[in-house]
Structures are given as structure tokens and as C-alpha cells.
């Protein structure tokens, strides 16, 4: 794999956090097991398979590589990425991508989704991202990723997965 940028790694339980940050230079992190990334101040080749990104704010050390990442995914015939960012930045980012698209003479397809403090984003039945306001010179949000788990009631803990499924399908509340 091409090593075009520094990547540090931290393993915590069943999750890996990879990326790098240097204030006013570049910030990019991802959790590969969850297929989520945070900020695109630069973009290592190894991060291409990460389809969903969360941008904290619009300083260049956090967004400079966003157009490059979108273009690379298009050139590699990958699905357009989904990029969450502060709602105040959406219109300007759309215009920026249009300008880059004209300069590059190629489309830059992506889903830009606005977020505000207090939003709860359901990525799947179990994976949720909650946003929070951050203090910074520009509009900024922080992200908390968590897994929603519903525990089985004690009387169903010895049942097999098939039995639990059948109970749920019959209308029984097992959690």
C-alpha cells in the first residue's frame, strides 16, 4: 500500500483508531471496523475504503483533502461518499466542489449532509452518532459514536438466535 501520509494507530478493545493530527497542518482519523472517518485535512490512500466521514469544522487543516477524496472515489468507481458537516458549511462546500469540478472537468459526487449540535444520526440499527457543539473560531461540532444495544430479558437469555427471532416475529417483546 502506498504510504503517502503519516498514520498513527491505537487499538482499544475491538476497535482501531487510525490517523494523524497536527494543529494547523492536517487532521484525519478513522475507525476502519465501523467504516467511519473524521476530518479530511489530508487523505492517506489506505483510507479510500472509508465511505462515511464526519467533518468537525471548515478550517483547511480539517477539509483540504475533501475534494481529492471525492475525486479519487469517483475515479476508482466507488460509491459516492457520505459526508456530514456543520450545516453552516454545506452551501459553501457545494460551491467549492462545483468550482473544483469545473477545474478538474470531472464530477465530484458525494452526499453532503448538514448537522447541528444535538443531532442523533442513526447509521444502522445499532450504530449511532450524536453531535455536540464545540467552541472554536468557526462553527464546529464534535461527534460521539456509540452502539445501541438492547439486552435480552433474563427469561430469554438461554434461547437460540432462531428462537429469539421466532418470538420477535410472533410479537413477543424479548428485550
What are these regions (language model features)?
Residues 116-175:
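Metal-dependent phosphodiesterase/nuclease catalytic metal-binding core
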Residues 44-47, 102, 136-138:
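Short glycine/serine/proline-enriched coil/turn segments at secondary-structure junctions
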Residues 79-81, 88-116:
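Active-site neighborhood of divalent metal-dependent phosphoester bond hydrolases
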Residues 15-18, 109-112, 129:
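Generic structural signal for residues in well-ordered beta-strands
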Residues 39-88:
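Active-site metal-binding motif and surrounding structural segment of the metallo-beta-lactamase
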Residues 66-72, 93-99, 144-145:
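Short, well-ordered amphipathic alpha-helices
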Residues 20-24, 114, 172:
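Short solvent-exposed loop/turn micro-motifs enriched in small/polar/acidic residues
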Residues 1-48, 142-145, 151:
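Conserved beta-strand hairpin/beta-sheet module of binuclear metal-dependent hydrolase folds
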Amino acid at each position: 500500500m502506498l504510504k503517502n501520509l503519516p498514520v498513527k494507530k491505537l487499538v482499544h478493545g475491538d476497535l482501531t483508531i487510525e490517523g494523524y493530527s497536527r494543529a494547523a497542518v492536517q487532521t484525519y482519523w478513522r475507525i476502519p471496523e465501523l467504516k467511519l472517518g473524521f476530518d479530511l485535512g489530508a487523505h492517506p490512500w489506505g483510507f479510500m475504503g472509508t465511505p462515511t466521514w464526519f467533518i468537525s469544522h471548515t478550517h483547511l487543516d480539517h477539509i483540504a483533502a475533501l475534494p481529492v477524496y471525492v475525486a479519487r472515489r469517483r475515479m476508482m468507481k466507488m460509491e459516492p461518499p457520505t459526508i456530514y458537516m456543520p450545516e453552516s458549511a454545506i452551501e459553501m462546500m457545494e460551491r467549492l466542489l462545483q468550482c473544483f469540478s469545473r477545474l478538474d472537468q470531472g464530477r465530484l459526487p458525494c452526499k453532503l449532509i448538514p448537522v447541528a449540535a444535538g443531532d442523533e444520526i442513526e447509521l444502522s440499527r445499532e450504530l449511532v452518532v450524536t453531535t455536540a457543539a464545540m467552541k472554536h473560531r468557526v462553527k464546529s461540532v464534535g461527534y460521539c459514536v456509540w452502539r445501541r444495544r438492547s439486552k435480552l430479558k433474563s427469561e430469554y437469555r438461554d434461547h437460540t438466535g432462531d428462537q429469539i427471532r421466532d418470538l420477535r416475529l410472533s410479537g413477543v417483546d424479548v428485550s
